[in-house]
Amino acid sequence: MRVITLSGITLFLLASLASAIELTFKLENQEKQCYYLDSFHTGEKTHFTYAVQSGGSFDVDYMIKAPSQKTVALGKKRRQADVFFTLEEKGEYEFCFDNHMSTFTDKIVTMEITMENELSLPALTRDEAKDYKKDSMQSTVLEISTALSEIDRVQNYFKTREHRNYSTVKSTQARIFWFSLAESIMVVALSALQVFIVKTFFKRSGRRGV
């Protein structure tokens, strides 16, 4: 089992904090990989998503565990998953992927974890706090951030579909090639068998005539 600790780039946008981690890795046959993410705050909204890009039936098992070993989410033989949850504990969250159902096939998996946490406003008077909340620049930045996140999610979706379709096309081409080769060998073998039968028939007929 392979264990990796994740670290991401944290972006501060005015009164909100968002961090995102994206990783593409190879999950070999009969292998289990676990990734660990440190949570220093509770209440953070987290979005976990993954998709199998190529390999076999494009499916793996996954499991998310809290620091207390409580199961947050799990799935069996899933091609992809979108999980939204809130970090309720401090410590290491565990994200595991299991490919034990595949005896020979390796998988390419893309995983992304996005966390958002609203920070408390600075100590201001009531009127200043109202003006701060209504600040148009903050609203614009938050709207742009939301729109960019949605665009990124859509792009990842189409990228995953493209990888899967490409892998399916390659697999189909390989099957067509081997099927055509086997068919050609069978045609040649049947032709040779027919020639052999005809020759044998005429040889026997010639002997009887003599």
UniProtKB/Swiss-Prot annotation:
Carbohydrate attachment residues: N165
Chain ranges of the GOLD domain: 32-115
Entry GO terms, CC: COPII-coated ER to Golgi transport vesicle; endoplasmic reticulum; endoplasmic reticulum membrane; endoplasmic reticulum-Golgi intermediate compartment; Golgi apparatus
GO biological process: endoplasmic reticulum to Golgi vesicle-mediated transport; Golgi organization; intracellular protein transport; protein retention in ER lumen
Segments on the Lumenal side according to the record's topology features: 21-175
Transmembrane residue ranges: 176-196
Protein family according to the UniProt entry: Belongs to the EMP24/GP25L family.
Protein known as: Uncharacterized membrane protein C17A5.08
Originating organism: Schizosaccharomyces pombe (strain 972 / ATCC 24843) (Fission yeast)
Source species taxonomy: Eukaryota, Fungi, Dikarya, Ascomycota, Taphrinomycotina
